[in-house]
């Protein structure tokens, strides 16, 4: 057995162990002498050997070309890359949540603003609104729209009185239809609302000024109704008494105006009430057909007056 050792020459240590077997060959020659004088073949035997080295990785001790990573755990690079990717993903997720929440709040605030802007809370004539003191359906009765030919002259006053006075079934004091337009725009039910309609404010001030100028005595006695439909200091009695005194003095036109004023307030622009028989003749002369609630001016209205009448829902004759 032969051991081969390789000397170190600037390379890592390499240890190799080999084993070889050397077999000596021998040849034998048998010579026989025979009478035939023939020769036999030559027999030979030979063997061969090879060296196989074992490879071992070099040691980092004393080798400056190998990084000493003994203080770092295994897979440090993968941990660092995964951490950076996770932080980026969490940042994107947080940004998406914040933008979605902000967009939802903005959309909801815009919807609330638009619902308040286009709602009917500042008018007394269109639909039922939670901002109104009482539902709009309580302002009218079913038997208001009746033709003039179906009722007698005595019942015309009753129809006007029914339109002026409404009642409730819960035995609770309430404002009459005549006093309702005089109430404040910001009532107990909508005092928390910061939105005030300019159109409603104009209508309110216009109605208030006209009522105080044209019929101040009708504002002295409010109507307080109970469930039995009995009124104390009735507004209708006030109108009747003032109408009777006016008839005695020969002022038929003033009677018609006094009766028409509350009827106009109690009715909506789309609901027209029948007037008293005393003023039918003068109304038909001064108004267009089917319009009994608006007094035609003696002269052509100015643009500002026309705008006020248009805001109040009046129909002017050309």
Curated annotation (Swiss-Prot):
Protein origin, superkingdom: Eukaryota
Bias (Polar residues) ranges: 276-285
A Gene Ontology cellular-component term: membrane
Subcellular location: Membrane
Ranges of biased composition (kind: Basic and acidic residues): 250-261, 309-318
Broad class of where this protein is predominantly found: membrane
Membrane disposition: Single-pass membrane protein
Residues bearing PTM Phosphoserine: 129, 279, 282, 288
Residue segments, region Disordered: 238-318
Transmembrane annotation, as ranges: 78-98
Metal-binding found in the keyword field: no
Cross-link (Glycyl lysine isopeptide (Lys-Gly) (interchain with G-Cter in ubiquitin)): 314
InterPro entries (UniProt xref): PRM
Alphabetically ordered keywords of this record: Isopeptide bond, Membrane, Phosphoprotein, Transmembrane, Transmembrane helix, Ubl conjugation
Keyword check for rRNA-binding: no
UniProt feature, compositional bias: Low complexity: 238-247
Stated family: Belongs to the PRM5 family.
Name of the molecule in the record: Pheromone-regulated membrane protein 5
């Amino acid at each position: 057995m032969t051991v081969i050792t390789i000397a170190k020459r600037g390379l890592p240590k390499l240890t190799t162990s080999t084993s070889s077997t050397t077999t000596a060959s021998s040849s034998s020659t048998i010579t026989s002498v025979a009478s035939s004088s023939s020769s036999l073949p030559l027999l030979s035997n030979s063997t061969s050997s090879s060296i196989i080295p074992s490879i071992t990785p070099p040691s980092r001790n004393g080798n400056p070309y190998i990084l000493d990573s003994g203080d770092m755990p295994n897979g440090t690079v993968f941990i660092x890359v995964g951490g950076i990717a996770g932080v980026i993903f969490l940042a994107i997720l947080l940004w998406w949540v914040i933008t979605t929440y902000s967009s939802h709040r903005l959309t909801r605030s815009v919807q609330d603003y638009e619902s308040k802007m286009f709602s009917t809370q500042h008018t007394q004539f269109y639909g039922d609104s939670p901002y109104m003191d009482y539902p709009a359906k309580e302002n009218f009765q079913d038997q208001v729209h009746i033709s003039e030919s179906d009722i007698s002259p005595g019942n015309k006053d009753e129809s006007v009185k029914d339109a002026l006075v409404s009642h409730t079934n819960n035995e609770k004091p309430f404002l009459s239809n005549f006093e309702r337009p005089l109430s404040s725009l910001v009532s107990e039910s909508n005092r928390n609302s910061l939105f005030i309609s300019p159109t409603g404010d104009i209508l309110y001030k216009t109605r208030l000024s006209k009522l105080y100028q044209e019929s101040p005595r009708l504002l002295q006695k409010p109507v307080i109704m109970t469930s039995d439909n009995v009124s104390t200091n009735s507004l209708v009695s006030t109108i009747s008494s003032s109408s009777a005194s006016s008839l005695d003095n020969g002022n038929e036109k003033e009677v018609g105006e006094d009766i028409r004023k509350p009827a106009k307030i109690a009715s909506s622009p789309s609901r027209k009430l029948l007037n008293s028989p005393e003023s039918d003749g003068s109304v038909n002369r001064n108004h267009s057909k089917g319009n009994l609630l608006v007094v035609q001016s003696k002269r052509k209205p100015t643009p500002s007056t026309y705008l006020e009448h248009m805001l109040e829902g009046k129909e002017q004759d050309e």
